[in-house]
Amino acid sequence: MVEVSEEDIRNLAARHQEFQRQAEGLKQQMNMVQASITSCDQATVTINELKTVSAEGKTAETMVPVGFGSFVYAEIKNADKVIVDLGAGFSAEETADEAVETLKRRKEQLTKILEQMSASLTKYIQGMQALEVEAEKLQQPSQA
């Protein structure tokens, strides 16, 4: 029978905790990426709705934040131009159609990143499961 040391069990537990910690961190990052995807979707819907209203010759009424939870009512008279965040603190003016395309590309990139993160999370979970199986095997001889 193989002798199992307390150090072996501690090492196994430490490895399991590390996998668990990494998996939790990855889940938090995945939630942030998912929130960005949702934000892209919301921006796309809003731009398209504003384009429709503008094409009908109407103005859209909205509320603009002025700070500290305060808003003023404003009318959007021209939805043909959109300021799009390019990242790293830079923005650019684009047509509404270009902005929708930019958001579509960004969403595709974020979706790929989310898929990669999901694959990594699966590996962490499989690693934890393998360690749990190993721990069960180590405990069985001592119970017999």
UniProtKB/Swiss-Prot annotation:
Its job: Molecular chaperone capable of stabilizing a range of proteins. Seems to fulfill an ATP-independent, HSP70-like function in archaeal de novo protein folding.
Organism from which the protein derives: Methanosarcina barkeri (strain Fusaro / DSM 804)
HAMAP family: PfdA
Coiled-coil positions: none
Signal peptide: none
Main location: cytoplasm
InterPro entries for the chain: PFD_alpha_archaea, Prefoldin, Prefoldin_subunit_alpha
The name this protein goes by in its record: Prefoldin subunit alpha
GO cellular component: cytoplasm; prefoldin complex
Key words, A-Z: Chaperone, Cytoplasm
A Pfam family the protein falls into: Prefoldin
NCBIfam families: prefoldin subunit alpha
Quaternary data: Heterohexamer of two alpha and four beta subunits.
Compartments where found: Cytoplasm
Highest rank taxon of the organism: Archaea
Gene3D superfamilies: 1.10.287.370
